Amino acid sequence: MPEGPEIRRAADNLEAAIKGKPLTDVWFAFPQLKTYQSQLIGQHVTHVETRGKALLTHFSNDLTLYSHNQLYGVWRVVDTGEESQTTRVLRVKLQTADKTILLYSASDIEMLTPEQLTMHPFLQRVGPDVLDPNLTPEVVKERLLSPRFRNRQFAGLLLDQAFLAGLGNYLRVEILWQVGLTGNHKAKDLNAAQLDALAHALLDIPRFSYATRGQVDENKHHGALFRFKVFHRDGELCERCGGIIEKTTLSSRPFYWCPGCQH
C-alpha cells in the first residue's frame, strides 16, 4: 500500500494537472455520486490535500471528494481525449480542457460538504500527518508519551494512523533501524535521548522520502537520495554494523531489522 510520501506526490501531480482550471466533464462510477456530476461542471479544483493515506480533492463550490486508495486504487493524469491503457476499473474522471485526472480501482470514495468533512469517521480518527510542516518533534514526543500511546509496542503503534498519519510498513522499519530500536519497545521505556531521536526520525524519514522524489515500485525505492537501509534487504549486510539483515513478522506485517545494531 502506498504510504504518506507516495500519496502526497500523487496529490502534487493532480494539482499540477488541473488545479484552477474549469472542469469540462465529470464522471463517477458509483450511483450515489452521479448527482454531483452536473454540479461540478464549470467548477475548479482549489487544492488537493492529504491526510495520511486519504486524499481530499477540494472544489470551488465547497464540496470535497474524499478518496482512500487502500491496496489497489491509483490516480493517473492523461491529456484530455487520450485513452489510458489499463485493465483497471475507472471510478472517477475529472476533465479540463487540456488535462484529465482518473481514479481507478478504489472503492472508498465519497463527496462531502464542509460539515460532513469535519465529521468524517476516518478523518476524525486519524492523527497528525507526518508531512504537515507545522508538526514538530516536540508534538510527536508528547504523543509518544501520552496515556493513549505510551504503553504501545512500536511494531503496532507505527502502523496505527491514529498515532501519526502517513506511516506504513517501509517507513516503520526504516525509522526503527535509524534509531537502533526493535519493534517490541514502548515509549515509556525509552530514555530522553532515545525519545528525542525517535521523535525526529518519525518526521525526518517520511519527509526525506517525499522530498527526494523516491518511488515505491515492485518492492524497490528509486530516488535521488532516499534508499532503503533494511526494507526488503533481508540476507544483505547492514551498512551500519555489518550484521545480516533479517526478516520476521510483527503486527501481521513483514518486519526487516538488523539484530547487530537494533536492540
UniProtKB/Swiss-Prot annotation:
Keywords: DNA damage, DNA repair, DNA-binding, Glycosidase, Hydrolase, Lyase, Metal-binding, Multifunctional enzyme, Zinc, Zinc-finger. InterPro entries: DNA_glyclase/AP_lyase_DNA-bd, DNA_glyclase_Znf_dom_DNA_BS, EcNei-like_N, Endonuclease-VIII, FPG_cat, MutM-like_N-ter, Ribosomal_uS13-like_H2TH, Znf_DNA_glyclase/AP_lyase. DNA binds at residues 70, 125, 169. The active site is at residues 2-3, 53, 253. It catalyses: 2'-deoxyribonucleotide-(2'-deoxyribose 5'-phosphate)-2'-deoxyribonucleotide-DNA = a 3'-end 2'-deoxyribonucleotide-(2,3-dehydro-2,3-deoxyribose 5'-phosphate)-DNA + a 5'-end 5'-phospho-2'-deoxyribonucleoside-DNA + H(+). CDD domains: EcNei-like_N. GO terms for biological process: base-excision repair. Its EC number is 3.2.2.-, 4.2.99.18. Binds 1 zinc ion per subunit. SUPFAM superfamilies: Glucocorticoid receptor-like (DNA-binding domain) (SSF57716), N-terminal domain of MutM-like DNA repair proteins (SSF81624), S13-like H2TH domain (SSF46946). Its cofactor is Zn(2+). One of its GO terms (molecular function) is class I DNA-(apurinic or apyrimidinic site) endonuclease activity. A zinc finger (FPG-type) spans 229-263. Belongs to the FPG family. Involved in base excision repair of DNA damaged by oxidation or by mutagenic agents. Acts as a DNA glycosylase that recognizes and removes damaged bases. Has a preference for oxidized pyrimidines, such as thymine glycol, 5,6-dihydrouracil and 5,6-dihydrothymine. Has AP (apurinic/apyrimidinic) lyase activity and introduces nicks in the DNA strand. Cleaves the DNA backbone by beta-delta elimination to generate a single-strand break at the site of the removed base with both 3'- and 5'-phosphates. This is Endonuclease 8. It comes from Shigella dysenteriae serotype 1 (strain Sd197). The lineage of its organism: Bacteria, Pseudomonadati, Pseudomonadota, Gammaproteobacteria, Enterobacterales.
